[in-house]
């Protein structure tokens, strides 16, 4: 029973993330055949330990001799770039994160560098520099504020927020 529930939640997470791209706002337009990018938010800490938000994009580029670590392409479609799989290199230990409705997590750092994908509800995050952003269904955040005082997380709205977290290796220095 527990395994089937987790599978159902995982499938829902993938569908939610994919579906949200169809309804993305203008600041984060969906990936298209023209843009081939996926917008994400990067929450990071500067040398003084103050966290900040930065908008970034994951590029769906096929591997080439010059860039052998890029994504893999379709082997069955006549157009090999009709499907490009972008691996999250080194990602193991994915978990679901639950936050009770109206809960507030005071100043804290990300426990490790990880992608966080919202699959239900909405959270409001305050960075160390005071900027506040809301993340709802399908939002992707690279949690990378591992030093300093971190950030505040609040559950907002009428639905308990749930997110899928995917740990990734530390950024190269």
Question: What is the role of each PLM region?
Answer:
Residues 1-9:
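Bacterial N-terminal signal peptides that target proteins for export
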Residues 98-101, 109-125:
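Short, conserved beta-strand element in jelly-roll/cupin
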Residues 89-92, 131-139, 145-172:
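Ligand-binding loop in jelly-roll beta-barrel domains
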Residues 9-20:
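Bacterial N-terminal signal peptides
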Residues 58-60, 75-80, 93-110, 145-148, ...:
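Conserved short histidine dyad/triad with adjacent acidic residue
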Residues 24-90:
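A short, N-terminal "cap"/entry segment at the start of jelly-roll beta-barrel domains
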């Amino acid at each position: 029973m527990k395994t089937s529930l987790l599978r159902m939640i995982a499938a829902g997470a993938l569908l939610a993330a994919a579906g949200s791209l169809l309804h993305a706002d203008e600041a984060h337009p969906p990936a298209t055949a023209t843009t081939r990018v996926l917008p994400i938010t990067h929450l990071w800490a500067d040398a003084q330990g103050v966290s900040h938000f930065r908008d970034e994009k994951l590029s769906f580029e096929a591997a080439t001799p010059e860039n052998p670590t890029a994504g893999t392409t379709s082997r069955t479609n006549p157009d090999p770039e009709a499907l490009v799989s972008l691996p999250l290199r080194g990602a193991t230990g994915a978990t679901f994160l639950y936050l009770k409705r109206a809960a507030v997590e005071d100043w804290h750092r990300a426990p490790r560098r990880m992608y966080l994908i919202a699959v239900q509800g909405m959270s409001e995050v305050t960075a160390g520099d005071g900027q506040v952003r809301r993340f709802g269904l399908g939002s992707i955040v690279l949690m990378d504020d591992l030093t300093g005082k971190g950030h505040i997380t609040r559950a907002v709205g009428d639905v308990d927020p749930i997110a899928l977290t995917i740990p990734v290796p530390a950024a190269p220095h």
